C-alpha cells in the first residue's frame, strides 16, 4: 500500500519512522524502517517526507504485544519486553524449537500469534516452571521473533535495493534484536541505524522533532480521536 500522510494523526508513527534522523545527520531518505512496538509491527519504505509504503506488517499480534503475553505466561511483570530480554541472557536460545510463522513466505507480512501459542503449549506441559526453564523459554522465544524480523528485513532490502535500514519503536530497545540486525551490515552492504534507548519509547523530543518538520509542510489537522490509527488511513 502506498501512503501519503496528510494529517496530525500520523505524528505517532512519524516520530518513530524519523527518530534516528535526530541523531544521525548522514541518514537521508529513502530508507527502510522496521517499526516494532506494542501496537505496531511493520516494515515501511520511507520514500520521502510524508510518503511511505507499507511493505509488510503483522497479521495478528504486534511484536511488543507478543512479548507482553509471553511474559505473563512466565509470571513476569508488565511491560514484559525488558524482563524477557533479561531472562534470555542466561538462557539457551536453542532449548525450544518454537514455530516461526511466515518466515519463509513470499511476502513481507509477519505473524506472531502462532509463536505465542507455541510457547503457551510448552509452558502448559511443564510442571516445575523454575527460573532456568523460564530463561530457556525466554531465550528461545526471543530468538524466534528476531529470526523472523531479520529474515523479513533481508527480503525488504533485496526488494527495494535500499542501502539504509532503521529500527524504531519500543521493541527496538531490545539489545539482541539490535545486534542481530546490525550483523546485516557487512553481509548485505547496508547501513543500520537505531535510536538511542531513550528515543525508542514514546517521548516529547521525537514529537517536537517531527512537529518542527511538519510545520514547514501543509497539513490538514482535522482528525478524530482513535486509540489505534492504521498508517494507510492517515
Which residue stretches match the model-derived regions?
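Single conserved hydrophobic/aromatic residue that forms the stacking wall/gate
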Residues: 1-12
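Glycine-rich phosphate-binding/hydrolytic loop that grips phosphoryl groups
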Residues: 16-20, 195-233
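Short beta-strand scaffold segments in enzyme catalytic cores
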Residues: 18, 33, 41-45
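Glycine-rich phosphate-binding loop plus the immediately following alpha-helix
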Residues: 25, 48-92, 116-117, 121-127
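Short glycine-aspartate micro-motif
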Residues: 31-35, 166
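Conserved phosphate-binding/catalytic loops in two-lobed NTP-binding clefts
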Residues: 165, 182-207
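A contiguous, well-structured pocket-lining segment that forms one wall/lid of small-molecule binding clefts
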Residues: 86-165, 174-188, 215, 232-234
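Conserved phosphate-binding catalytic cores of ATP/NTP-utilizing and phosphoryl-transfer enzymes
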Residues: 10-32, 210-211
Amino acid at each position: 500500500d502506498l501512503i501519503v500522510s496528510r494529517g496530525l494523526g500520523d505524528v505517532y508513527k512519524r516520530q518513530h519512522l524519523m527518530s534516528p534522523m535526530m541523531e544521525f545527520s548522514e541518514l537521508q531518505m529513502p530508507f527502510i524502517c522496521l517499526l516494532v512496538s506494542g501496537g505496531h509491527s511493520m516494515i515501511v519504505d520511507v520514500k520521502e517526507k510524508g510518503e511511505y509504503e507499507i511493505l509488510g506488517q503483522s497479521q495478528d499480534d504486534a511484536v511488543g504485544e507478543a512479548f507482553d503475553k509471553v511474559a505473563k505466561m512466565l509470571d513476569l511483570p508488565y511491560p514484559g519486553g525488558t524482563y524477557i530480554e533479561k531472562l534470555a541472557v542466561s538462557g539457551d536460545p536453542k532449548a525450544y524449537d518454537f514455530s516461526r510463522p511466515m518466515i519463509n513466505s513470499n511476502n513481507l507480512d509477519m505473524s506472531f500469534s502462532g509463536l505465542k501459542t507455541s510457547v503457551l503449549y510448552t509452558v502448559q506441559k511443564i510442571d516445575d516452571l523454575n527460573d532456568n526453564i523460564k530463561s530457556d523459554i525466554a531465550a528461545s522465544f526471543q530468538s524466534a521473533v528476531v529470526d523472523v524480523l531479520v529474515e523479513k528485513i533481508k527480503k525488504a532490502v533485496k526488494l527495494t535495493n535500499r542501502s539504509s535500514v532503521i529500527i524504531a519503536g519500543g521493541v527496538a530497545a531490545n539489545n539482541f534484536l539490535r545486534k542481530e540486525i546490525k550483523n546485516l551490515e557487512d553481509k548485505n552492504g547496508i547501513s543500520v541505524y537505531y535510536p538511542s534507548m531513550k528515543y525508542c519509547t514514546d517521548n516529547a523530543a521525537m514529537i517536537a522533532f517531527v512537529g518542527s518538520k511538519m510545520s514547514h509542510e501543509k497539513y490538514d489537522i482535522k482528525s478524530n480521536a482513535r486509540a489505534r490509527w492504521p498508517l494507510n488511513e492517515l
